[in-house]
C-alpha cells in the first residue's frame, strides 16, 4: 500500500475529514489531498505531525510496519489528555483553579482513572 493510501486510511480511521485534519496540522487542504493521492510526499516534520494526529507510527505510514497502532501507553496518554481537554472546553472541570489541579484533586483524578482502567479490564475479561 502506498504512503498516500495509508495516510487516507489512517485519517479516516481517526475520524477526520481532510479539511479537519489539514486545519489541525496547519497545512492547506490541497497539500493534504496531494499527499493522499501520492502527488507529493510530506516532509519529515509533517509526516511526524500526521503520525501523531492519526495515532499511528511513522513506520506504518512509510510501509515499514504493518501495525498501525503506536504502543498502548501512547494511546492511553492521548486518550486521557483528549478527555481532559474536552472537559475543560465544556467547563466541566469546575474544581480546577485557573486550569490547574490542586494536590487533592490530582490524587482523586488518579484514583478514578485507576479504578476506571481496572473496570475496563474486568469487562474485557468477560467478553
From Swiss-Prot:
<feature type="region of interest" description="Disordered">
    <location>
        <begin position="1"/>
        <end position="22"/>
    </location>
</feature>
<keyword id="KW-0238">DNA-binding</keyword>
<protein>
    <recommendedName>
        <fullName>HTH-type transcriptional regulator ImmR</fullName>
    </recommendedName>
</protein>
<dbReference type="GO" id="GO:0003677">
    <property type="term" value="F:DNA binding"/>
</dbReference>
<dbReference type="InterPro" id="IPR001387">
    <property type="entry name" value="Cro/C1-type_HTH"/>
</dbReference>
<feature type="domain" description="HTH cro/C1-type">
    <location>
        <begin position="7"/>
        <end position="61"/>
    </location>
</feature>
<keyword id="KW-0804">Transcription</keyword>
<feature type="DNA-binding region" description="H-T-H motif">
    <location>
        <begin position="18"/>
        <end position="37"/>
    </location>
</feature>
<dbReference type="InterPro" id="IPR010982">
    <property type="entry name" value="Lambda_DNA-bd_dom_sf"/>
</dbReference>
<feature type="compositionally biased region" description="Basic and acidic residues">
    <location>
        <begin position="1"/>
        <end position="12"/>
    </location>
</feature>
<keyword id="KW-0805">Transcription regulation</keyword>
<dbReference type="Pfam" id="PF01381">
    <property type="entry name" value="HTH_3"/>
</dbReference>
Amino acid at each position: 500500500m502506498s504512503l498516500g493510501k495509508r495516510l487516507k486510511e489512517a485519517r479516516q480511521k481517526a475520524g477526520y475529514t481532510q479539511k479537519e485534519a489539514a486545519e489541525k496540522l496547519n497545512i492547506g487542504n490541497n497539500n493534504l489531498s496531494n499527499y493522499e493521492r501520492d502527488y507529493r510526499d510530506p516532509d519529515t516534520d509533517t509526516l511526524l505531525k500526521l503520525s501523531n494526529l492519526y495515532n499511528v507510527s511513522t513506520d506504518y505510514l512509510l510501509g515499514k510496519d504493518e501495525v498501525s497502532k503506536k504502543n498502548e501507553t501512547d494511546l492511553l496518554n492521548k486518550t486521557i489528555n483528549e478527555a481532559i481537554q474536552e472537559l475543560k472546553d465544556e467547563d466541566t472541570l469546575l474544581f480546577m483553579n485557573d486550569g490547574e489541579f490542586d494536590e487533592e484533586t490530582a490524587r482523586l483524578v488518579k484514583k478514578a482513572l485507576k479504578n476506571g482502567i481496572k473496570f475496563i479490564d474486568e469487562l474485557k475479561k468477560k467478553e
